[in-house]
Curated annotation (Swiss-Prot):
It holds the Pfam family MJ1316. It comes from Pyrococcus abyssi (strain GE5 / Orsay). Belongs to the UPF0248 family. This is UPF0248 protein PYRAB10580.
Length: 83
């Protein structure tokens, strides 16, 4: 697993030319969805200061549970899950 904040990990995925954002997705806590989680491709999100955006919808970073590569490798995981 990579070290750093979820925002740092996402910034590396989105802006480092060695990474391909198409290869990653995030799992967020999303009440009302099946299992209360939602899978979102990294390519459709925009990073903000305390939030990330999907279109005009802003979602706080603390709702991200995992960042996962499409081969299933978890590259970042929330402390909520690690407990």
């Amino acid at each position: 697993m990579r070290k750093g904040t979820v925002k740092e990990v996402l910034a590396k995925i989105k802006y480092d030319p060695r990474e391909n954002e198409e290869d990653y997705y995030i799992i967020i806590e999303h009440r009302g969805s099946y299992g209360n989680v939602r899978k979102i491709p990294v390519r459709i999100i925009e990073l903000g200061h305390g939030y990330f955006f999907i279109g005009e919808t802003q979602i706080p970073y603390h709702r991200i549970l995992k960042v996962v590569r499409k081969d299933g490798k978890v590259v970042w995981e929330s402390r909520k899950i690690r407990k």
